[in-house]
């Protein structure tokens, strides 16, 4: 029995009913998958998840060989790879209203503050105070969390990315520039595609 099945939908209204449905969709869509696992790590007073930890067991780019000289002419920055990433999904109190979307952020440090591999992708912030933040252009407020989790898996595989300087602009302009100038021309972003 899935954990969400312990709850009856008719015992909830409004936001809590939406939270239950999101939880069920995540459990259904990710059931039996080895490449993506999801667990509830914080709950509200009704026992429904408001924070998830998503583990991606996918090979993806996690940086480049000479990041200190990124963008300098003549410097070849080959990609570095990792196979495990962790992302938090935080659901704010006003979710799912348009001004209270869920936030998606890859962990960049472990619980002791040591750096950990996080994705190098133009739609995921790599540098700065907001490193790890994921830019997801969701079609509408009815887009479920499971769609977002699967979309991020496409990001990690480089099946989907937006690196050109036009709307909706890339989340990380430095990574986007690398994708255009080195990643695409050298074929480095084309790996493990299904």
Indicate where each model-derived feature is located.
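UBC/E2-like fold recognition across ubiquitin and ubiquitin-like conjugation systems
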Residues: 1-84, 94-194
């Amino acid at each position: 029995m899935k954990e969400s099945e312990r709850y009856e939908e008719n015992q909830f209204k409004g936001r809590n009913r939406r939270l239950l449905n999101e939880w069920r969709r995540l459990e259904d869509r990710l059931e039996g998958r080895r490449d993506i696992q999801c667990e509830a790590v914080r709950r509200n007073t009704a026992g429904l998840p408001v924070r998830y930890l998503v583990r991606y067991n996918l090979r993806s780019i996690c940086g480049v060989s000479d990041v200190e000289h990124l963008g300098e002419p003549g410097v070849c920055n080959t990609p570095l790879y990792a196979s495990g990433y962790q992302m938090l999904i935080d659901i704010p109190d006003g979710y799912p209203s348009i001004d209270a979307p869920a936030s998606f952020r890859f962990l960049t440090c472990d619980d002791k503050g040591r750096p950990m591999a996080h994705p190098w992708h133009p739609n995921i912030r790599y540098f700065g105070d907001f490193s790890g933040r994921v830019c997801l252009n969701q079609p509408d407020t009815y887009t479920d969390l499971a769609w977002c989790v699967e979309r991020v898996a496409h990001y990690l595989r480089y099946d989907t990315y937006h690196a050109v300087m036009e709307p909706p602009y890339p989340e990380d302009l430095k990574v986007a520039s690398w994708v255009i100038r080195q990643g695409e021309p050298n074929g480095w972003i084309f790996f493990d595609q299904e």
